[in-house]
Amino acid sequence: MIEIRLHGRGGQGAVTASRLLATAAFLESKYSQSIPMYGTERRGAPVTAFVRIGEKEKMVRSLIHEPDYVVVLDPLLRKTVDITEGLREDGMLVLNSSIPPEEIELLKPYRVATVDATNISLKTLGRPITNTAILGAFCRATGEVGLDSVIGAVKQQWPGRLGELNAKAVEEAFENTHVGNPRIIEEMKRTVAPVESRADWRTFKPEVDVSKCTGCKMCWIFCPEHCIEMVEGKSVVNYDFCKGCGICAEECPVGAMSMRIESETEE
Protein backbone atom coordinates (compact mmCIF):
# COMPACT_ATOMS: atom_id res chain seq x y z
CA MET A 1 0.00 0.00 0.00
CA ILE A 2 1.21 3.50 -0.78
CA GLU A 3 0.10 6.64 1.03
CA ILE A 4 -0.02 10.11 -0.50
CA ARG A 5 -0.55 13.55 1.02
CA LEU A 6 -1.61 16.51 -1.11
CA HIS A 7 -1.12 20.16 -0.17
CA GLY A 8 -2.93 22.98 -1.92
CA ARG A 9 -5.10 26.02 -1.42
CA GLY A 10 -8.82 26.49 -1.63
CA GLY A 11 -9.75 26.84 -5.29
CA GLN A 12 -6.79 24.88 -6.69
CA GLY A 13 -8.58 21.53 -6.60
CA ALA A 14 -6.50 19.55 -4.09
CA VAL A 15 -9.55 17.63 -2.86
CA THR A 16 -10.64 16.90 -6.43
CA ALA A 17 -7.08 15.79 -7.24
CA SER A 18 -7.21 13.25 -4.42
CA ARG A 19 -10.50 11.92 -5.74
CA LEU A 20 -9.19 11.71 -9.31
CA LEU A 21 -6.08 9.86 -8.16
CA ALA A 22 -8.18 7.37 -6.19
CA THR A 23 -10.47 6.89 -9.19
CA ALA A 24 -7.49 6.30 -11.49
CA ALA A 25 -6.24 3.58 -9.15
CA PHE A 26 -9.73 2.06 -9.04
CA LEU A 27 -9.76 1.92 -12.85
CA GLU A 28 -6.62 -0.22 -12.56
CA SER A 29 -8.50 -2.64 -10.27
CA LYS A 30 -6.68 -1.40 -7.17
CA TYR A 31 -8.18 -0.54 -3.81
CA SER A 32 -8.10 3.18 -3.08
CA GLN A 33 -9.27 5.82 -0.62
CA SER A 34 -9.62 9.57 -1.02
CA ILE A 35 -9.64 11.43 2.30
CA PRO A 36 -10.14 15.21 2.26
CA MET A 37 -9.39 17.37 5.29
CA TYR A 38 -10.86 20.84 5.28
CA GLY A 39 -13.29 22.96 7.22
CA THR A 40 -14.64 26.41 6.41
CA GLU A 41 -11.55 27.58 4.53
CA ARG A 42 -12.03 30.26 1.93
CA ARG A 43 -10.44 30.38 -1.49
CA GLY A 44 -6.69 30.65 -0.97
CA ALA A 45 -6.57 29.01 2.46
CA PRO A 46 -4.35 25.91 2.87
CA VAL A 47 -6.09 22.59 2.20
CA THR A 48 -4.82 19.03 2.74
CA ALA A 49 -6.08 15.78 1.22
CA PHE A 50 -4.89 12.16 1.36
CA VAL A 51 -4.96 9.08 -0.86
CA ARG A 52 -4.28 5.41 -0.15
CA ILE A 53 -3.68 2.94 -2.98
CA GLY A 54 -3.06 -0.79 -2.61
CA GLU A 55 -3.53 -4.23 -4.08
CA LYS A 56 -5.42 -5.39 -0.98
CA GLU A 57 -8.32 -3.81 0.85
CA LYS A 58 -7.42 -1.87 4.00
CA MET A 59 -9.85 -1.15 6.80
CA VAL A 60 -7.90 1.84 8.15
CA ARG A 61 -9.59 5.17 7.40
CA SER A 62 -7.40 7.55 9.39
CA LEU A 63 -5.47 10.55 8.13
CA ILE A 64 -2.01 9.86 6.74
CA HIS A 65 0.91 10.99 8.89
CA GLU A 66 3.85 9.21 7.23
CA PRO A 67 3.24 9.44 3.47
CA ASP A 68 5.31 7.83 0.75
CA TYR A 69 4.63 10.78 -1.53
CA VAL A 70 3.83 14.43 -0.97
CA VAL A 71 2.18 16.36 -3.81
CA VAL A 72 2.21 20.18 -3.62
CA LEU A 73 -0.13 22.16 -5.87
CA ASP A 74 0.99 25.63 -4.79
CA PRO A 75 4.65 26.65 -5.24
CA LEU A 76 4.60 29.07 -2.29
CA LEU A 77 3.27 26.67 0.34
CA ARG A 78 6.72 25.31 1.08
CA LYS A 79 7.68 28.73 2.45
CA THR A 80 5.18 28.59 5.30
CA VAL A 81 4.17 24.92 5.62
CA ASP A 82 6.43 21.98 6.51
CA ILE A 83 5.50 19.95 3.44
CA THR A 84 8.01 17.21 4.29
CA GLU A 85 6.59 16.54 7.75
CA GLY A 86 6.39 12.78 8.27
CA LEU A 87 7.60 11.98 4.74
CA ARG A 88 9.33 8.60 4.71
CA GLU A 89 13.10 8.50 4.28
CA ASP A 90 12.77 7.07 0.76
CA GLY A 91 9.82 9.33 -0.07
CA MET A 92 9.31 11.69 -2.97
CA LEU A 93 8.07 15.26 -3.36
CA VAL A 94 6.09 16.22 -6.45
CA LEU A 95 6.13 20.02 -6.63
CA ASN A 96 4.45 22.65 -8.74
CA SER A 97 7.55 24.70 -9.45
CA SER A 98 9.23 26.29 -12.43
CA ILE A 99 12.72 25.57 -11.11
CA PRO A 100 14.57 22.26 -11.56
CA PRO A 101 14.75 19.67 -8.75
CA GLU A 102 18.47 20.33 -8.26
CA GLU A 103 17.69 23.88 -7.09
CA ILE A 104 15.00 22.89 -4.58
CA GLU A 105 16.37 23.31 -1.04
CA LEU A 106 15.52 20.56 1.47
CA LEU A 107 16.86 19.28 4.77
CA LYS A 108 16.88 15.63 3.67
CA PRO A 109 17.77 13.87 0.40
CA TYR A 110 14.25 13.09 -0.75
CA ARG A 111 13.63 12.48 -4.43
CA VAL A 112 12.05 15.51 -6.07
CA ALA A 113 9.93 15.98 -9.17
CA THR A 114 9.00 19.44 -10.46
CA VAL A 115 6.65 20.70 -13.14
CA ASP A 116 5.41 24.20 -13.94
CA ALA A 117 1.78 23.25 -13.35
CA THR A 118 0.65 26.86 -12.99
CA ASN A 119 1.73 27.89 -16.49
CA ILE A 120 0.47 24.62 -17.98
CA SER A 121 -2.93 25.20 -16.38
CA LEU A 122 -3.06 28.80 -17.56
CA LYS A 123 -2.20 27.73 -21.10
CA THR A 124 -4.63 24.81 -21.32
CA LEU A 125 -7.48 25.87 -19.02
CA GLY A 126 -7.07 29.63 -18.87
CA ARG A 127 -7.06 29.47 -15.06
CA PRO A 128 -4.41 28.59 -12.43
CA ILE A 129 -6.24 25.44 -11.28
CA THR A 130 -3.30 23.07 -11.02
CA ASN A 131 -4.86 19.82 -9.85
CA THR A 132 -4.97 17.91 -13.13
CA ALA A 133 -1.54 19.10 -14.27
CA ILE A 134 0.09 18.00 -11.02
CA LEU A 135 -1.44 14.53 -11.46
CA GLY A 136 0.33 14.24 -14.79
CA ALA A 137 3.58 14.96 -12.98
CA PHE A 138 2.74 12.37 -10.33
CA CYS A 139 2.21 9.72 -13.03
CA ARG A 140 5.53 10.52 -14.70
CA ALA A 141 7.57 10.73 -11.51
CA THR A 142 6.21 7.75 -9.59
CA GLY A 143 4.65 5.27 -12.00
CA GLU A 144 2.15 4.34 -9.27
CA VAL A 145 -0.79 4.96 -11.61
CA GLY A 146 -0.86 5.01 -15.38
CA LEU A 147 -1.34 8.09 -17.54
CA ASP A 148 -4.31 6.54 -19.34
CA SER A 149 -5.99 5.80 -16.01
CA VAL A 150 -5.66 9.40 -14.84
CA ILE A 151 -6.99 10.69 -18.15
CA GLY A 152 -9.87 8.23 -17.84
CA ALA A 153 -10.65 9.53 -14.35
CA VAL A 154 -10.49 13.13 -15.60
CA LYS A 155 -12.90 12.49 -18.47
CA GLN A 156 -15.22 10.63 -16.11
CA GLN A 157 -15.22 13.65 -13.79
CA TRP A 158 -15.73 16.21 -16.59
CA PRO A 159 -17.36 14.85 -19.75
CA GLY A 160 -17.04 16.91 -22.92
CA ARG A 161 -14.74 19.82 -23.69
CA LEU A 162 -13.73 20.53 -20.09
CA GLY A 163 -12.56 16.95 -19.71
CA GLU A 164 -10.55 17.20 -22.93
CA LEU A 165 -8.84 20.40 -21.74
CA ASN A 166 -7.96 18.86 -18.39
CA ALA A 167 -6.69 15.72 -20.11
CA LYS A 168 -4.43 17.95 -22.20
CA ALA A 169 -3.09 19.53 -19.00
CA VAL A 170 -2.34 16.05 -17.63
CA GLU A 171 -0.49 15.03 -20.80
CA GLU A 172 1.53 18.23 -21.06
CA ALA A 173 2.60 18.02 -17.42
CA PHE A 174 3.53 14.36 -17.92
CA GLU A 175 5.84 15.35 -20.78
CA ASN A 176 7.43 18.27 -18.90
CA THR A 177 8.13 16.77 -15.48
CA HIS A 178 11.72 16.73 -14.24
CA VAL A 179 12.99 14.32 -11.57
CA GLY A 180 16.21 14.72 -9.62
CA ASN A 181 17.89 15.26 -6.28
CA PRO A 182 17.48 18.46 -4.23
CA ARG A 183 20.10 20.76 -2.78
CA ILE A 184 20.64 19.72 0.85
CA ILE A 185 20.85 22.56 3.38
CA GLU A 186 21.27 22.64 7.16
CA GLU A 187 18.40 24.97 7.99
CA MET A 188 15.18 25.75 6.15
CA LYS A 189 14.31 29.39 5.64
CA ARG A 190 10.81 30.30 6.78
CA THR A 191 8.84 33.42 5.93
CA VAL A 192 7.76 35.37 9.00
CA ALA A 193 4.77 37.55 8.16
CA PRO A 194 2.30 39.59 10.21
CA VAL A 195 -0.28 37.48 12.05
CA GLU A 196 -3.11 38.57 9.74
CA SER A 197 -1.04 38.35 6.54
CA ARG A 198 -2.65 36.66 3.54
CA ALA A 199 0.30 37.21 1.22
CA ASP A 200 0.90 33.49 0.72
CA TRP A 201 -2.68 32.98 -0.51
CA ARG A 202 -2.11 34.57 -3.90
CA THR A 203 -1.12 33.06 -7.22
CA PHE A 204 -0.65 36.40 -8.98
CA LYS A 205 1.09 39.51 -7.71
CA PRO A 206 0.33 43.10 -8.82
CA GLU A 207 3.27 45.23 -9.87
CA VAL A 208 3.22 49.00 -10.41
CA ASP A 209 4.95 50.71 -13.31
CA VAL A 210 5.65 54.02 -11.59
CA SER A 211 6.44 55.70 -14.91
CA LYS A 212 2.85 55.08 -16.07
CA CYS A 213 1.04 55.71 -12.77
CA THR A 214 -0.90 59.00 -12.86
CA GLY A 215 -2.03 58.87 -9.24
CA CYS A 216 -5.71 58.66 -10.22
CA LYS A 217 -6.39 56.44 -7.18
CA MET A 218 -8.66 54.03 -9.08
CA CYS A 219 -6.70 51.06 -7.71
CA TRP A 220 -6.83 52.54 -4.22
CA ILE A 221 -10.62 53.02 -4.48
CA PHE A 222 -11.43 49.53 -5.75
CA CYS A 223 -8.94 47.42 -3.75
CA PRO A 224 -11.15 45.15 -1.56
CA GLU A 225 -8.33 44.53 0.94
CA HIS A 226 -7.33 48.21 1.34
CA CYS A 227 -3.71 47.26 0.76
CA ILE A 228 -2.83 50.04 -1.71
CA GLU A 229 -1.42 53.30 -0.44
CA MET A 230 -0.64 56.53 -2.24
CA VAL A 231 2.94 57.64 -1.64
CA GLU A 232 4.08 60.88 -3.25
CA GLY A 233 1.20 60.62 -5.69
CA LYS A 234 1.99 57.06 -6.79
CA SER A 235 0.40 53.69 -5.95
CA VAL A 236 2.27 51.40 -3.55
CA VAL A 237 1.06 47.87 -2.77
CA ASN A 238 1.33 46.42 0.74
CA TYR A 239 2.13 42.83 -0.23
CA ASP A 240 1.62 41.50 3.31
CA PHE A 241 -2.13 41.86 2.82
CA CYS A 242 -2.60 41.63 -0.96
CA LYS A 243 -4.40 38.44 -2.07
CA GLY A 244 -3.66 38.98 -5.75
CA CYS A 245 -7.28 39.34 -6.87
CA GLY A 246 -6.25 41.50 -9.85
CA ILE A 247 -8.99 44.11 -9.44
CA CYS A 248 -6.41 46.89 -9.32
CA ALA A 249 -4.98 45.87 -12.69
CA GLU A 250 -8.48 45.62 -14.20
CA GLU A 251 -9.46 49.09 -12.98
CA CYS A 252 -6.23 50.92 -13.83
CA PRO A 253 -7.10 53.15 -16.81
CA VAL A 254 -3.51 53.59 -18.00
CA GLY A 255 -2.14 50.05 -17.62
CA ALA A 256 0.24 50.95 -14.80
CA MET A 257 -0.78 47.83 -12.85
CA SER A 258 0.12 44.38 -14.18
CA MET A 259 -0.25 40.90 -12.70
CA ARG A 260 2.66 38.46 -12.58
CA ILE A 261 2.79 34.88 -11.36
CA GLU A 262 3.97 35.12 -7.74
CA SER A 263 6.31 32.13 -7.88
CA GLU A 264 8.16 33.63 -10.85
CA THR A 265 8.82 36.84 -8.93
CA GLU A 266 10.06 34.83 -5.93
CA GLU A 267 12.08 32.11 -7.66
What are these regions (language model features)?
Residues 1-200, 211-214, 265-267:
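Active-site cofactor/cluster-binding pocket
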Residues 194, 200-206, 232-234:
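Short Cys/His-rich Zn2+-coordinating modules
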Residues 208, 218-236, 247-264:
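Iron-sulfur cluster-binding cysteine motifs and their immediate structural context
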